[in-house]
Structure formats: C-alpha cells, structure tokens
C-alpha cells in the first residue's frame, strides 16, 4: 500500500533530477461544462519526470439505509479513515445531491457524504453535484422519479482540474422495475489529474447501468458507446486513468452478464478508446469483477499498472464482514513523462 507522502516524495525526487523545466504552455481553464481546449493537449515537461501513485476505486454502497441491503449509516463512518492511505480515491454511490423535498431529504442519508470525508486529509476534492439542470436533465419532464445525484466523487493528494459530470443519455428501472437506475443520475465524471508540474492526465470515474435484462443490456452498450465518444472528443491524444463500477460482468458465468454480452461491451470499449484493463496488464486472476480500472498512455506521458488488488481484508467491520457490497480495488500506477 502506498501513501500519498511516499508517492509525493518519489515525484519530487524524480523531478529534481530532471534536466531543465521547459513546459508547454497550458491553455486557460474554463467552466465545468467545457474545458475542451485545456483537456485536449497534455502538458508535458521536457525534463524527464516519473513517479507512482495508488488509485482506489470504491462503490461505498451509500444508498439510503431505508432502501439499502447494506448498513451505510453504520459502515460509512468506518470506511472514511480507511481511505486515508491512498493517493487518489474514486467513489461511487457517494451521493451529495438529493431531490429537494424528496424522499431522501428527511433521512439520515443526507449526512453520509460528509461522514465519508470526515477522516481523510486529501487536499483536492470534487465539489457537490450541481443538480440535474446543470447537467441537462429536466427532472419533471425526463425523470420525475429521480431522487439522487450521480454518486461520483474524487479525493486526491494531487491537484485536480475542472470537473465535468455527464449523465447517461437514458436509463431503465424505477422503484418497482429493473435495477432502479432511473432513481439516480448515473453517468461519469471527467477531470484532470496533475502528476507533476506541467504533467497531467485525464481522470474518469463512472457508474454503469445495472441489471441483466434486455433493456439493461441495451443501455449498457449505449452507455459505453457514449463514454467512448466523449473520450474521443475531450481526451484525444491524452493519457487517461479511468475507474469505477462498470456493472459489466466479464466472467461469462454471471447471470447478469448477458451470455457474453458484457464481455463484448467491455472489449469494444477498450478497443475504441485505446485503454488497457489493469487486470489484463497485471495478469490478475479476477478479470470478471465489475469494479475495473483502465488506462492508456498519451501526450508524452507513459502509464503502467504495477499492481491490481482488491482490498477485501482491509475494508471490513469488527466481524470481518465487508463494509460495502463491493470490495475496493487498488491499482498502483507508475508514470513517466518527458
């Protein structure tokens, strides 16, 4: 396990040994909804810099206690200090927006997000979801039963840039149908991660459509086509770190895997974007898990996955039970620029 301090010291040492500091001029940043110009060109230092960071992706099962099969009101405060050692943490079901006057507003659920962040010292954090109108959703006309935000969050010891939150174009499932995906603004989050002075990569956090019915399978394919198109438009030529709960069962045996449909969706997405699954890169033995990390090099920044490990033994309660219905995935990423 790699602490932020250790990663930071390695980066500082590598940069200090570099020869010169000629940096490509970075474009000025724009608002969360745009930022295309700034994100389309990777800033790269002419002096060789290198380092390592620990990336954790974790679905924290933060649905309201009243509708959850887990125990978020008890477990989320226990999760918080366990996030501290990691350099970059990407969360799912970490909800920080709920419908004003909705069902969740009168419950203890509204405190989960702040409790999740209560015992960590990461300096750089995503701000609260701006609400449906800010991401192009007319809640009354399009999703009248929607109650929650996208549940996506970033905690980082490295600087992050402007944040763009993008909901999936469509969803399936209400209170009494499918996997209830239309109750939240599921989608993906895009920002930049500054590895060192003048060295940045694009960072994506996502939560995919759940369920294994025909409607779910069709939407899962649509979702990853939408994400691939966004990456082509916003991250052309750039290095990328992408992680999250894909809800793609790529083990060919799971009942929600669509008899291999999920395998094909993930394979097609990786081919379209040039990303590599960290499980494949490290020859891991659990490639069927739905929590995934993928990466690619670009813009003068080389990335590699040095380890891929689910932290099942750490994120548990006093009885050894998992604190979420997902185990967090840690991937150690090595990088080199110049």
PLM features per residue range, with description:
Residues 1-18:
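N-terminal export and membrane-targeting signals
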Residues 14-16, 26-119, 130-139, 144-149, ...:
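N-terminal, active-site-proximal structural segment of metallo-dependent hydrolase catalytic domains
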Residues 39, 231-241, 248-338:
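Metal-dependent phosphoester-hydrolase catalytic domains
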Residues 47-50, 83-84, 118, 144-149, ...:
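Extracellular/periplasmic catalytic domains that process cell-envelope and extracellular macromolecules
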Residues 53-60, 79-105, 155, 191-193, ...:
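Active-site beta-strand/loop signature of hydrolases that rely on acidic residues for catalysis
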Residues 56-63, 91-95, 125-134, 156-158, ...:
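Active-site-proximal beta-strand/loop segments in catalytic clefts of secreted hydrolases
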Residues 63-68, 168-180, 207-218, 250:
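Surface-exposed cleft-lining segments at the edges of enzyme active sites
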Residues 95-200, 208, 307:
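Structured beta-strand-rich core segments of catalytic domains in phosphoester-bond hydrolases
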